[in-house]
UniProtKB/Swiss-Prot annotation:
Compartments it resides in: Mitochondrion
GO CC field: mitochondrion
Biological role stated in the UniProt entry: Hydrolyzes 3-hydroxyisobutyryl-CoA (HIBYL-CoA), a saline catabolite. Has high activity toward isobutyryl-CoA. Could be an isobutyryl-CoA dehydrogenase that functions in valine catabolism. Also hydrolyzes 3-hydroxypropanoyl-CoA.
GO biological process: one example: valine catabolic process
Protein name per UniProt: 3-hydroxyisobutyryl-CoA hydrolase, mitochondrial
Mitochondrion among keywords: yes
Key words, A-Z: Branched-chain amino acid catabolism, Hydrolase, Mitochondrion, Transit peptide
Listed EC numbers: 3.1.2.4
Disulfide bonds, paired cysteine numbers: none
Annotated catalysed reactions: 3-hydroxy-2-methylpropanoyl-CoA + H2O = 3-hydroxy-2-methylpropanoate + CoA + H(+)
UniProt binding sites for substrate: 120, 145, 168, 176
Matching InterPro entries: ClpP/crotonase-like_dom_sf, ECH_dom, HIBYL-CoA-H
Enzyme class per UniProt: hydrolase
């Protein structure tokens, strides 16, 4: 009897090992190179690879559904010490959410107009609250949904190829994915400029704006990734040290002045205005080439989106990340009920005539009452994180 008791654990060991292997295969099953997202474990690192290079790694609903549970599983796994996210191809980390699919769903009355935003914000919140160090390699175009997959993580590594923007007001949306949280927390009124005009930041300027935490040469990323994977049971500090060493070795544009430096006083003054109408007026009064260019950009945007965005940033400046996602979900559903999102997608992505017919067509026609209604709670339909 005693022998049996002693032997039992030995018999169970191979079975336990098999269970672990099967569980590992379950959690890393999306490794087919044809899959839209690859989820793999290498050493102590969980690696997420966005794998839709032909559409600039646009984030589909299916990808969101795969990434969220994997991040949660790795967060609980004692053998996973960090998470790395990257994009396939040479052009983009992730150019944004799959807005065309969302627009099609909205026209068809499909629930995806609710499901997509709910699950995307849950994923972005999981990244923002992840207990494991999270490293986003934002090489190439990083916009919209791609910003949500990166900006809330511990480490964001930009390269000379990085192009950052939040261009949502051009398609009748607003800078979501937690934009209401991180944008007003950037230096001065940089976040307001980015949100309202869709201004693009490139290369080292993404670091200087406070969006990236590190800057590394694009060609060095495979080596950096290899070194990250090789770290043995790393702490957040160990990972930071490695990233810092690569950052310090990168000399590209090191002496170049931040693209917005010479305009900061102007940006802070103009974008501190209390209303969109006042911002437009200040841009007109300024008359500088920089102000004129921003005015031209704003004049192309959805007036409704501009007013929602300005209020979103003002409210979000004092909110928790979770409260911002709740607010943004309400705004997303207001946009799904409206006109401008579908018109913006038509003009920019479908017909590509770049001539959206916004309704209302002027800022003055977007009432405070309408804006207030967009921020109202949705009762049982509110976002639950």
């Amino acid at each position: 009897m005693a022998a049996r008791v002693l032997m039992a654990p030995r018999r169970l060991k191979p079975f336990n090992r098999l269970q672990v292997i099967l569980q590992h295969l379950k959690t890393c099953k999306h490794t087919d190179s044809a899959a839209d997202v690859l989820l793999q474990k290498q050493g102590g690192a969980g690696i997420i690879t966005l794998n839709r290079p032909k559409v600039l790694n646009a984030l589909s609903f299916k990808m969101i559904q795969q990434i969220y549970p994997q991040i949660k599983a790795w967060e609980q796994d004692p053998e996973t010490f960090l998470i790395i996210i990257k994009g396939t191809g040479e052009k983009a980390f992730c150019a944004g959410g799959d807005v065309r699919a969302i627009a099609d769903a909205g026209k068809a009355g499909d629930t995806m107009t609710r499901d997509y935003f709910r699950e995307e914000y849950r994923l972005d919140n999981a990244i923002g609250t992840c207990k494991k160090p999270y490293v986003a390699l934002i090489d190439g175009i990083t916009m919209g949904g791609g910003v949500g997959l990166s900006v809330h993580g511990h480490f964001r590594v930009a390269t000379e190829k990085t192009v950052f923007a939040m261009p949502e007001t051009a398609i009748g949306l607003f800078p979501d994915v937690g934009g209401g949280y991180f944008l007003p927390r950037l230096s001065g009124k940089i976040g307001h400029l980015l949100a309202l005009t869709g201004f693009r930041l490139k290369g080292r300027d993404v670091l200087k704006a406070g969006i990236a935490t590190h800057f590394v040469e694009s060609g060095k990323l495979p080596e950096l990734e290899k070194d990250l994977i090789a770290l043995k049971s790393p702490s957040k500090e160990n990972i930071a040290d490695l990233l810092n060493s690569y950052h310090m070795q990168t000399k590209i544009d090191q002496e170049k002045e931040f693209v917005l430096d010479e305009h900061m006083e102007r940006i802070n003054s103009i974008f501190s205005a209390n209303s969109m109408e006042e911002i437009v007026q200040k841009l007109k009064q300024d008359g500088s080439p920089f102000a004129t260019k921003q005015l031209e950009a704003i004049n192309k945007m959805s007036p409704t989106s501009l007013k929602l965005t300005l209020r979103q940033l003002r409210e979000g400046a004092t909110m928790s990340l979770q409260d911002v996602f709740t607010m943004e979900y309400r705004l997303s559903q207001a946009c799904m009920r409206g006109h401008d999102f579908y018109e913006g997608v038509r003009a920019v992505l479908i017909d590509k005539d770049q001539s959206p017919r916004w309704k209302p067509a002027a800022l003055e026609e977007v009432s405070d009452e309408f804006v207030d209604n967009c921020f109202k709670p949705l009762g049982n339909n509110d976002l639950k994180l």
